[in-house]
């Protein structure tokens, strides 16, 4: 968060969607609306199951109305492609659309941090990375050595960031070039564990960790990603069910320990009761559980995310997280965004 770091994100799934009806198909597969989306831009998108629960997330990049590239989570890459194929063949066989995995056709590097624009300008010195010429969530193809690469301005850390897609044959040379061009900035290579911490500080979810198959976009504070004027998409009808819109559903919140020297364990129950040494005939009411928890060196205390029943109404209140030996840790319920809530850093 002070200079820059680089991550090898090649394992993320990448799917190419083509055809005369590609735009219609993408609009049906994801909650967002892509109808007015400009070419060479990307959009963070949610995919739901028929039950309205979050199935996957990723970035949808529009090359034109008949050509899209979407990213998926690593673990769901194959299932998302199968999900698309199933609906294309059984539900909408009249759509002129086809898709294929291009995950192994590109290595992907994620450069992130306040110095990332300077480093990108050194590595690709013929490209203008200014805000005017390269705004947030835009992308373009460029020549690099004797091949073509794609650069997308996006961030999963909350900092100014870029995703670089390069053929595997040129990946090592480009990786080395980043470090040669940034010696005075001490560019740091980082892995998925660090990425998990950085995204949690920003309140970004990981599907499968902060979701469990029973979570809707509204539960995750992501209702802004639902196209309000869309006639249909997978899961749309389910989102109107009475059980789905109850305020008492489990909702994503942030947790901060009252005692900043203490940590919070993932998977532990969140409760209202401090004293757990009660008779078994008085069972403790479990409000939810901790989905993600890390010690933040940037904030110098633990930060956690949790799914809590009626969580939005509990923001600002004090609850307790169970630990071993019938002990508890007092926590404050906060918005699930611990760093830069106004998103100023990634818009630099």
Task: State each model region's role.
Residues 1-45, 53:
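Acidic, proline/glycine-enriched N-terminal capping motif
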Residues 13, 45, 58-59, 140, ...:
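Residue-level detector of beta-strand structural context in well-folded domains
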Residues 64-348:
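Conserved, structured C-terminal
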Residues 7-20, 62-69, 109-111:
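N-terminal glycine-rich flavin-associated loop
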Residues 3, 12-13, 28-33, 50, ...:
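Proteins with a high burden of low-complexity, intrinsically disordered sequence enriched in S/T/G/P/A and R
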Residues 33-87:
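Well-ordered mid-protein domain cores that form the structural environment of catalytic cofactors
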Residues 8, 57, 163:
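Acidic active-site catalytic centers that drive phospho-/nucleotidyl reactions
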